[in-house]
Regions:
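Acidic, metal/ion-coordinating pockets
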Residues: 1-259
């Protein structure tokens, strides 16, 4: 099974990049399942029903989220109604939506788990991602999942690597999101889990994490707190492909994507 995971899609330009690139990429790489992190897919940050529907129409099987998932209030009922758009599972219990889904692909099923880190993201009041992962992996196994995939939306590289090694051999693929910078460490961990610390982003290349460069420069240089605005220009799509052997449920190859 070939799994394509696409990094944080930024605004309408990022969505448009997915629309233009994904069909050809799926065909050329013989992709079976597509997971897209869409927590920044709306132009004003966050995700909306419109941007989620757009990504599903482009070919996403599952959309994952993160710390910006609830930036737009209208997404709350959408998260409750659509089981294939996720928000981090370890957010407080009263949070709308879910952080786990089971995708039925016919001859196999894929469980997708979405978690958020706790380092530098304390305001989210998220529970321990290690313990949450334990619970959700047990649920996936009880549900008969053939493959388990984790999107860990986290700030700290150390937290991502630690959870990746903790889950090695228990999940088929583990990828990080959130930083918008693709890491060059895609690998297969010792017990067979495909891993990358961060997928990167799908957004404007000449930007600061998808935001207009002058806004970020002015904030860092002089403390100007102007509103973040999406950058304009040519976009790149970042992601990673995991080829997973269904019998041992382990990754046999990883390939970074930068288009």
């Amino acid at each position: 099974m070939r799994l394509l995971c696409i990094g944080d899609v930024c605004g309408s330009l990022g969505c448009e990049k997915v629309r233009r690139v994904l069909p050809t990429l799926k065909r050329q790489e013989k992709i079976d399942v597509v997971i897209i992190n869409g927590e920044n897919s709306a132009d004003n940050n966050g995700v909306t029903p419109f941007s989620a529907d757009y990504l599903f129409a482009c070919g996403a099987d599952v959309i994952t989220g993160g710390n910006h998932s609830f930036r737009n209030e209208e997404i709350r009922s959408y998260l409750d109604d659509n089981q294939f758009i996720l928000r981090p599972s370890n957010l407080p219990e009263e949070t709308n939506g879910r952080g786990y889904c089971l995708l039925d692909m016919g001859r196999y099923s894929v469980a997708v788990i979405n978690l958020v880190g706790t380092i530098y993201l304390e305001r989210l009041k998220a529970s321990n991602p290690f313990l949450a992962a334990d619970e959700l992996i047990e649920k996936a196994e009880n549900d008969g999942a053939d493959i388990i995939v984790v999107d860990f939306h986290a700030e700290a590289t150390s937290e991502k690597r630690a959870l990746g090694f903790y889950l090695d051999g228990r999940v088929s693929a583990f990828f990080g999101t959130h930083t918008h910078i693709q890491t060059a460490d895609n690998k297969i961990l010792p017990k067979g889990t495909g891993y990358i610390t961060d997928l990167g982003m799908t957004g404007v290349e000449n930007s600061v994490l998808g935001v207009k460069t002058e806004i970020i420069i002015n904030r860092l240089k002089s403390g100007d707190m102007s509103k973040f605005l999406q950058a304009e220009g040519e976009c790149t799509l970042n992601g990673c492909i995991f080829e997973i052997d269904l019998a041992p449920r382990k990754t046999v190859e990883t390939k970074r994507i930068l288009i």
